[in-house]
């Protein structure tokens, strides 16, 4: 995704798919820092979903160089949650939406459209 319009379209698509139940939103909680983020931020899993549903094009960081499972693009965002910048990486597959990363950012995020 290179343009703000492409990011807006991606976000609209995943939001519709999640909110209508067409696609499940799967979190990779097996990754320690993703699970730890819920504790560090003092948020519930449902709050995490709401944060993803609130993403805007202005929160877009970049499209990652690699691919999830060698075939699906990964898109990264940042969001301020309880005064912490949270790094969020999402991939859209034909079967669902995968949140690969959701944790406090380890580096400053340079937003593409802010």
Features from the language model and the residues they span:
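Functional cores of ribonucleases/endoribonucleases
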Residues: 53-96
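Compact soluble domain cores
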Residues: 2-5, 9-71
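Enriched for short, Lys/Arg-rich terminal
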Residues: 91-114
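Charged, low-complexity, helix/coiled-coil-prone segments
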Residues: 31-33, 84, 109
């Amino acid at each position: 995704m290179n343009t703000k319009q492409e990011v807006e379209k991606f976000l609209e698509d995943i939001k519709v798919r999640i909110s209508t139940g067409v696609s499940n939103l799967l979190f990779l909680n097996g990754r320690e820092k993703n699970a730890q983020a819920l504790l560090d931020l003092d948020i519930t899993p449902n709050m995490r979903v709401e944060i993803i549903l609130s993403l805007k094009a202005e929160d877009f960081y970049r499209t990652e160089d690699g691919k999830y499972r060698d075939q699906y693009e990964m898109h990264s965002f940042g969001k301020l949650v309880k005064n912490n910048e949270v790094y969020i990486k999402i991939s859209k597959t034909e079967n669902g939406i995968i949140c690969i990363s959701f944790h406090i950012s380890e580096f400053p995020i340079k937003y593409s459209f802010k």
